[in-house]
Amino acid sequence: MALWGGRFTQAADKRFKDFNDSLRFDYRLAEQDIQGSIGWSKALVKVNVLTVEEQHQLEQALNELLVEVRSNPQAILQDDAEDIHSWVESKLIDKVGNLGKKLHTGRSRNDQVAVDIKLWCKQRVVELQESVRNLQRHLVQTAENTQQAVMPGYTHLQRAQPITFAHWCMAYVEMFDRDYSRLTDAYNRMNTCPLGSGALAGTAYAVDRDSLAHDLSFAFATRNSLDSVSDRDHIVELLSIASLSMAHLSRFAEDMIIFNSGEANFVELSDRVTSGSSLMPQKKNPDACELIRGKTGRVIGSLTSMLITLKGLPLAYNKDMQEDKEGIFDALDTWQNCVDMATFVLDELKVNVERTREAALKGYSNATELADYLVSKGVPFRDSHHIVGETVVYAIEKGKGLEDLTIPEFRQFSEVVGDDVYEILSLQSCLDKRCAKGGVSPLRVAEAIAEAKTRFA
């Protein structure tokens, strides 16, 4: 049943109907459309469009429909309705007859879909935050279990300074904490109710929109009807958050792929998140991580698509805005699936502590400690930096680590070097010295883990 047929003398061509209809994807808004309709029915009682008895009858029928939708949402797709709003109204009329035709009084599909998508986005924010927090908890648990796993830290993918696997885990805890916080901010901004804005100029019925907003669990009503029906900022914002978080997940996945490589051999991924080769029987491929990395472009693409769709639209509603749904549905589903898969990857991750330590001992990652040591002996840092660079070149030529050089060898480059240099060149000293807040010292990492466990409890 179309909601707009009276103006037309010809039926829509099937090709146009197939092109125009959105039920195949906006059926996902069924619960929100029903919730919004219940709220609207209560508002219509207060302006004498519906009696209390009529409202109760409508609410009962809508709640029955809600139960049906929750039990089998896919059944909606068997219908020929144009969109989810048409489907709900048609089913309501089937249940209560002509009374169902009164519900749309004073309401437009423009404000109806606006409230539906906001309700859906609010619900998804809560679900996404649960997944992000769960990933953070797994990262913290992994960190707690790997505090003794010393490994190289990298810049430019070159060994830089020693860190621990725990410190690496906690870096991602911080990234995902910002994603969690952004979701909270987005929720607060989208927590305004557009219902009652009509097609664009507001409704002709003096509904109490603030009361309606509270009935639908919004903080307050939107302030401008034109903006209300054309606003898709919340979709863009969620797509932006999803894109940034996927970038974080992609970096996590890339690190894991490198750490899992035969060349690094820092970690071993579980058989449950890897796959084999149809040709090479020895292969164990990090497909879970590769797919997380690969799906990042898909989510970022949805953000780009939405921005391009919106950029040239005049106020207020335009049918272009129907294109908002498939992108946000797919992007948030993909994001949550990737968050959950990253959590699963951590579940049975094995860290090769001996191998990470062996790698940390190579690459002259204690060179900065030698430079700081020279500074403590009165050598200006810029000079000490140059001296250590020359010392490293010498050590490379000799095939030695800095800690393996003799005092006479050190003194070829600086006379201030004494026997106390060896203590500061040890891995443990390298870690212990990084004791400022946020540093890699075991004490600071343990504090960060304890604080995060308390925060996420």
Curated annotation (Swiss-Prot):
Reactions catalysed, as given in the entry: 2-(N(omega)-L-arginino)succinate = fumarate + L-arginine
Source organism (scientific name): Haemophilus influenzae (strain 86-028NP)
Pfam families found in the cross-reference section: ASL_C2, Lyase_1
Protein name as catalogued: Argininosuccinate lyase
Gene: argH
Major subcellular site: cytoplasm
Pathway as given in its UniProt record: Amino-acid biosynthesis; L-arginine biosynthesis; L-arginine from L-ornithine and carbamoyl phosphate: step 3/3
Its EC number(s): 4.3.2.1
Stored PANTHER family: ARGININOSUCCINATE LYASE
